[in-house]
Amino acid sequence: MGTNTPLKGIKVLELGGLAPSPFAGLVLADYGADVVRIDRPTTPFGPPRDTLCRHKRSIVIDLKSPSSRDAFLTLVKVADVLIDPYRPGVMSRLGLGPERLTKLNPRLIYAHLHGFRPDGMYGQAAGHDLNYLAVSGILSIVGRKNEKPSPPANILGDFAGGGLVCVTGILFALLHRHSTGRGQVVTTNMVDGSAYLATFPRQQHGHQNMDRPRGENLLDGAAPFYEVYETKDGRFVAVGAQEPQFYAQLLHGLGLGKRKLPEQWDRTHWPAMKSRFEGIFKSKTMNEWRAVFDGTDGCVSPVLQWDEVEKPYKPLVELSESPSLDVSVQEDFPEVKKGEGCSEVLKEWVPEVQAKMRVDEQTKVLTMKGRDVKL
C-alpha cells in the first residue's frame, strides 16, 4: 500500500457481491485502504469474474461453517469497515448482523449497501440498476419525446447512487469515529442514493424549462442548443451551448453567425432550429467539427468511444498531500483469484492467531483449526 495515502491503515472486509459493493471497495482500495474481499467457496452461477478488484486481496469464508465463521469473526475484531451487500436481514439470520459484530468490535463501521429502501415496499425484492432507477423516479425523466423511458446503462444506480454513496457514508463514519472512538452502522441503498443525486431535477420539476413531459424540456432533448447530433460519418457530437455568449459561438461555428435567426429561447422555433442544426452537422465528419469547435467556447464536444478518451485514467480526486494509488494498473480485466493474498493478510492482520488457522488446499476456505461441523 502507498506510504502516504489518505486511507492507509484502514482495514476493510468487503463481502463478495456484484458491481456496487466491489466498486465501493475499489474506491477505498485506490486511496490506500487494505481491502480484503470475502469470497464464498461456491456461487450459484460459478466463480464470478470480479474486474473491480484493483489493489485488493481475497479470503474465502464459508459462513455456514462454525470453524470458518470463527475465522471470519477473528478478522472482524481487527477490521475498521465491513461492507455488506446483501438484502436486509441476511447477515442477521446467520448470526452475523451489525448487532453482534459492532458489539464484538465497537470501532467497526458496518456498511449496508442495499438495492431497494430496506423499510420500503420493495425492501426484500430482487432488483438491478434499472429497477432502482424506476422506483427512484429518475427513469421517468430519461428518454425521448413520445418514447418509452430509456435504460441509461448501469452507472447511475449501481455505481453513483450505490457504490459511491456507500463510500461517502463510510468516510462520514470514519470522521465521526476519529472524534468519538466509536464505530456505527451505515445504511445506504441505491434507490435513495440515486434519488438524492437527482435533487436538482426533482426540485426543478414543474418549473420553467422543466415543466413539460419527458423529452420536451430544456435539458432532455427539446432545445436545439442542448442536444446530440449525428455527423456525416455516422458519429456524434454533443452540444450544450445554453448561455448567450456560448450560443453565439455555436452559431458562428455552424456558419449562422450573420443570419437573422429566431430568439434563442423562443420554444416555438426550437423544432425548426433543431432540424436546421441536424442538416448542418451532417455536412461534416466528427473530426471536421472538432477542427471547427475545439479551442472555442461553442460547447460542442465529440462523443468519444472508450478507446478514444484521454489517457491515462485519473483517480476519483487528486490530492496534493496524500495521493491515491495508481488507478491505471490492471485496466484490462484484472482478476484476484479466490484466496489470493490470504496468508499475507493473516500475517499482517492477526499474526498472533495465524497459527490457529488453516486454509483448505482445494476450496481455499479459511477455518479455525479444530471445528468443521456445518450449521
Question: Which sequence ranges carry the predicted segments?
Answer:
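Redox-cofactor-proximal catalytic regions of oxidoreductases
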Residues: D50-T74, Y132-S140, V317-V329
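Acyl-CoA thioester-binding alpha/beta core of soluble enzymes
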Residues: M1-T42, I109-A111, Y196-L375
